[in-house]
């Protein structure tokens, strides 16, 4: 259910400051968003996967906390990140 190495590398290069920047908030938010989108398609077909749904809710909560941190520290990057990812806020 995780993302492929190529997909992660593409996201890191797109949102990171350089090719090895995996720790910045923008990259972490983008990776979590990709995983969440992937899992949403999984739950469309596997409606009774309650254990997996708990993991999805943890990811959503973690993304929410990272977005709150980014908004608190750098409002311009926050606005740019949610616009590029198409998140509503």
Swiss-Prot record:
* Superkingdom of origin: Bacteria
The gene it comes from is rpsO
Enumerate the SMART domains for this protein: Ribosomal_S15
Subunit field text: Part of the 30S ribosomal subunit. Forms a bridge to the 50S subunit in the 70S ribosome, contacting the 23S rRNA.
Recall the GO molecular function terms of this protein's record: rRNA binding; structural constituent of ribosome
Q: What's this protein's name? A: Small ribosomal subunit protein uS15
Q: Which GO terms describe its biological process?
A: translation
Q: Which PANTHER family match?
A: RIBOSOMAL PROTEIN S15, BACTERIAL AND ORGANELLAR, SMALL RIBOSOMAL SUBUNIT PROTEIN US15M
- Protein species of origin: Haemophilus ducreyi (strain 35000HP / ATCC 700724)
Q: Which family does it belong to?
A: Belongs to the universal ribosomal protein uS15 family.
Note the Pfam families from the entry.
Ribosomal_S15
């Amino acid at each position: 259910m995780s993302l492929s190495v190529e997909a992660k590398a593409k996201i890191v290069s797109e949102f990171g400051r350089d090719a090895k920047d995996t720790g910045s908030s923008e990259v972490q938010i983008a990776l979590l968003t990709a995983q969440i989108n992937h899992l949403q398609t999984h739950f469309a077909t596997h409606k009774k996967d309650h254990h997996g749904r708990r993991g999805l809710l943890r990811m959503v909560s973690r993304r929410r906390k990272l977005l709150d941190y980014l908004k608190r520290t750098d409002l311009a990057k926050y606005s740019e990140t949610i616009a590029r990812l198409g998140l509503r806020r």
